[in-house]
Amino acid sequence: MRTINKILDKIGKVQKGKSLLWQLYPLLFREDLYAIAYNRSSSELSLKSMKHRDSSDRYSLVIIKRLINRIRNQTTSKLLFQGSDRKNLKINRSLFEGLTVLFEMIIPVESRPLVQYQSEWNSLQSIHSIFLFMEDRFFYSNSILGLKIPYYFHPEMIIRLFRRRIKDVFLLHLVRLLFHNYQNPFVPETSLFYSLKDSQKRLSILLRNHYFYEFENQLVPLWKRFVQLQSLSHRFLMDQTNPLYKMKHGLGSLQPFLSEINLLETPCIHYVRYENHSIIAFKGTKSIVNKWIKYLVGFWQYNYHYWLQPCQIDIRRPSRRCFSFMGYILGFRSRMIKVHTKRIDESSTTHCIIKEFCASIPTSSLIESLTREGFCDSSGRPVGRSTWTILKDDDILNKYHQIWGDLSCYYSGSFSRDGLWRAKYILQLSCAKTLAQKHKSTTRVVRNHFGLKFITTLNSVKNPFFIGSQEYSHRKNFWCLDIIRMNSLVNLINMKKESLSSS
C-alpha cells in the first residue's frame, strides 16, 4: 500500500503541475503506475483488484511487466535505423503504450478526447449541441469564415508545445525520435495510422486534440482583447418613453442631459469547431472580413509556421449563400408569422417577417455516398449488396436497420427531409434486392415472404424521438442530443466536399 500511495501522490503532483514537469521519463519504468493509470476510472485503486482481473484483460499486471521489459530493452539505434522492420515496429508499440498513459496525465482535461462510446446519456457530449448554439448565435452574424485547421504539421511543433509544460529533456528526446521516425503518427489520413494498435490511435487523437487546444487557447484571449478594444458607441434617447409621467413629475428640465446617452455595443464573435473544421461568425463589413483573413494568415504563420493561403479561407454571407458543415447545408430563411393584438374595444392582426436558422440535407451528396457504398448505382437506382448474401437474413435486415437508424437520428434536425425519404426508399429496395439475390428470387416474393418484418425494419428507429413520430411535426426540427460522433456516410459527404474544394 505504501508503494501505491507514493505513486498516487506522484500522479497527483504531475496532474497539478502547471508549468514545470521535470521527472517524467522514469515514470515509464514504473509498473504500478501503469496499473493505476489504466484503472483510475474505476473506484477500486488497488493491486488486489488488478491481480484478480480476467487473464484475457489487456491491462493485467503480467502484460504491464512485459511492457516495462520491452521499454528497458529498447535502444536508440533501433529507433534511428529500424526502417520498416516488423520486429522493431512491435518493440516501438510498447513505447506508444507508455507515452499514451503519460500524456493522458500531462495534457489538460480540456484537450482530452471525448469517449466515443458512453453507457449513459449525456447531452453535453452531443455534436448536435453545436447546431443548437448556431441556431441561437449565428442569427446575428452577417459574415462567416470557414477554416480547415491543418492536420499535416511538422512533428517538431508538437515538441515545442510540450516544452511549455514538460522540462524533462530525456522524455522530449524520446518523443522526438518516435515522431520523426514515424513521420506524422498523429495524422489519421496516413496508412500508418490504420496499422497502429488502439493505444497508438488513442495517442494520435490525444495529440491532435492537444494541438487544437493550444491553438484555441492562444486565439480566444486575443479575441477577448479585440472585443474590449473595438467597442462601438450608439446614441439612445431615453426621454421618449413615458412622456406623461415625466411631464407630471417635472423631468423636462433634465431633457438636455438625458437626450444623448452613449451605450456600448460590443461585436459578437462566434467560434465553432468539430475535428479540424472550424467556423468563425461575426458581424462586419467587407473590409473587416479582409482584416480577419490577414489576421488568421499571420497568426498561423508566426505561431505555428504554417503558411495559410487566403484562398483556403471560405467566405460566406449567410443571407445570400448557404454553407456546408458536418454533413448539413446551413443557412437562413425568412418566415412570416401572424401576431394578434387585442385591445378593450377592438383587435387587429399583423404579419411579421422573421429570419430563422435552417439546416437541410445535401440530397445529391447523400445519394452519391450511398452509391459509393454500393446501395445504388450512379443514377440513384437501388441495387443489392452481393457481398452480404453470405449473411443470415436477420443479419442483413439488422444491417440495413442500423444504417437507416443512424441516418434518421443524425438528420433529425433538418428542415426538409425529402433527402431522407429518398435514402429510405433506396435502402428498402436495396435490402429487398439483396435478399432476393441470396434466395434467387424476386423482390415481390421476398416482401411477401417476410411480410410485416420487412416493412417494420426501416420504420422503427432505436431513438424514441424518431422522424416518423406523431409527437413532432415534419415542420419542426428535433436535434437528437445523444450523438457523439458522425455517421460514416456523412463522413463520405465531407470527404467529397473537401476534394472538390481542394481541386
UniProtKB/Swiss-Prot annotation:
InterPro entries listed in its UniProt record: Domain_X (IPR024937), Maturase_MatK (IPR002866), Maturase_MatK_N (IPR024942)
Compartments it resides in: Plastid, Chloroplast
GO molecular function (one): RNA binding
Principal location class: plastid
One GO-annotated biological process of the protein: mRNA processing
Keywords assigned by UniProt, alphabetized: Chloroplast, mRNA processing, Plastid, RNA-binding, tRNA processing
Leader peptide range in chain numbering: none
Entry GO CC: chloroplast
PANTHER family: MATURASE K (PTHR34811:SF1)
Family from the record: Belongs to the intron maturase 2 family. MatK subfamily.
HAMAP family assigned: MatK (MF_01390)
Biological function: Usually encoded in the trnK tRNA gene intron. Probably assists in splicing its own and other chloroplast group II introns.
Protein name according to UniProt: Maturase K
